[in-house]
Amino acid sequence: MTTQTLLIELLTEELPPKALNNLGNHFAAAVAEGLEKAQLVDGAAEFTAYASPRRLAVQVKNVKAVQADQKIVKKGPAVANAVKDGAPTKALEGFARGAGAKIEDLTIVHDGKQDVYAYEYVQTGKPLGGLLEDIINAAVKKLPIPKVMRWGSSTFTFVRPVHGLIVLHGGDIVNVSVLGLQSSNQTLGHRFLSNGEITIENADSYAAQMREQGKVVASFAERKAAIQTALEGQARRLNATVAADEALLDEVTALVEYPVVLEAGFEEHFLAVPQECLILTMQQNQKYFPLLDQNGKLMNRFLLVSNLQTEDPSHIIRGNERVLRARLSDAEFFYKQDQKATLESRLPKLANVVYHNKIGSQAERIERLQSIAAHIAKALDADAAAAERAARLAKADLVTEMVGEFPELQGTMGKYYARLDGETEEIAEAIEQHYQPRFAGDKLPESKIAAAVALADKLETLVGIWGIGLIPTGDKDPYALRRAALGILRMLMQYGLDVNELIQTAFDSFPKGLLNEKTPSETADFMQARLAVLLQNDYPQDIVAAVLAKQPRRLDDLTAKLQAVAAFKQLPEAAALAAANKRVQNLLKKADAELGEVNESLLQQDEEKALFAAAQGLQPKIAAAVAEGNFQTALSELASVKPQVDAFFDGVMVMAEDAAVKQNRLNLLNRLAEQMNAVADIALLGE
């Protein structure tokens, strides 16, 4: 059967730029899936997604014009039960009637268990046109659109009004109706660069015709690559690098159909404003691409992506420069205004900034942060006074003009204003870095002072918000407590502090009775659960569970322990020792009395005497290795007692009739368990 390329295009009004690529990919994948289910393609569909500001399209290779005929076998009652006294039973008659057949048309087949009556027939394949309308409608309904709209007098809904529909199989129009539109082979190109309607001659010529006749680069990926290449080329010419992230590049790609990269500039005096402010306003407000010199300093040149190609782009450049000048003038004004007051003088205003109505204002919060940060700094052997000062000023920039306009700059502006106020560089940097890490993979604070304030900030948030009952549930975490917990854990894995003690310190900083009394224990459990999630990104679940079963309160040696357990797991003796450890733990649960020291005089059998001697020799070796942080050595020592452990369980009845002997053997196993689990609960390995 011959096949041809299928093309579907929805011509729309301007689609949401941040969602465009996702919409295009979902639409294409859903159409391809529908074609596969309808058996209009053989195997997995080979498709290309297209998405530009005014269109979603998909091109699918090797689509059949008609489904293949299918042999259908409907199975009915068992032969043994279908005929009675030479006449068909009601079950057989009902099956034939339901199948639309006569009894004499039925055949007998084997269903794998027994012979059954069946009706076999050939189902004629349906034409593409009879199936495609439902496939497209289903694909439209599957799109991830949080809010839809209606347009004109239409009752149909979509993310934006739809004005055109192309459905081509090869060069033939497939007659379907979707969203109130009849399919055709005509579309529109670029709003300003194309000349009216474009007739797509063939499904395979879509991309080329759109580019040549419509001045539209229909492929999102192709536009993005073209923009990136042009940006990098322009930057190299200027001996600069582009300050841009993937999100900005994606958004700009979604805003243009025929991208042209242009160079523009602004007055040098604006560079006196902190470059973070200028970069943010260029990227966020104007969707421009700032340029950095070889030292990472902002240049007074930038790149913009125009949706127009002209012989003389100077008017486009001047227009964009004029708009940016107004934006940068605002930033310059805010910066100058903010310098009229010190951070210290702004602190009283924080009393009017509500943190949460149940736990007070930012001013009250600052008092808590100061005490927590000073405590942590002492524990880190850092300057407690500097940490307290940094914590005092950490939130003062929240009431500045610049942060009011650009909340993303909180902390960053605090750093600049602290420098202008004569604060030390260490305090200024701590003010900025106390928000770190902001997200997974973000860098940690660089100094102990900054780490103390950052830990204080996140601990106070976690304990305070949790303590008033605003606990994360499902996908709801409005106060980002999970993120705060992960930030705390990442810092504590660098600094050797007791996590439970820090939680208690944060809890004690709140007025007595304000928070739920169970908050310290509940947040400690929450942190343990988040720690497991964090570690499972890099280590198998059983290794993480084994290490965390010891409920470590200091996290700076966690990585070493995890690596040691991973190495131990590879030893030939590991599986048997893990199983033995599990058996030991199960036996210890049956102890009637409190476990204590081993009484050598009650050791009766050679196997238990040998195990006692081995455990005695093992204890100082493991203790020394653990004390030195050499956890791999500690675990590898366990391999030496495997023969004695095996012999003990093969030859000794632990739960002896003599109560004293039984207790002594349990004491021996308890001593062994302490050594086996000095680093991790190895019984959990392999589970």
Swiss-Prot record:
It is found in: Cytoplasm. Transmembrane segments: none annotated. Its EC number is 6.1.1.14. It catalyses: tRNA(Gly) + glycine + ATP = glycyl-tRNA(Gly) + AMP + diphosphate. Tetramer of two alpha and two beta subunits. Belongs to the class-II aminoacyl-tRNA synthetase family. This is Glycine--tRNA ligase beta subunit. It comes from Neisseria meningitidis serogroup C / serotype 2a (strain ATCC 700532 / DSM 15464 / FAM18). The gene is glyS.
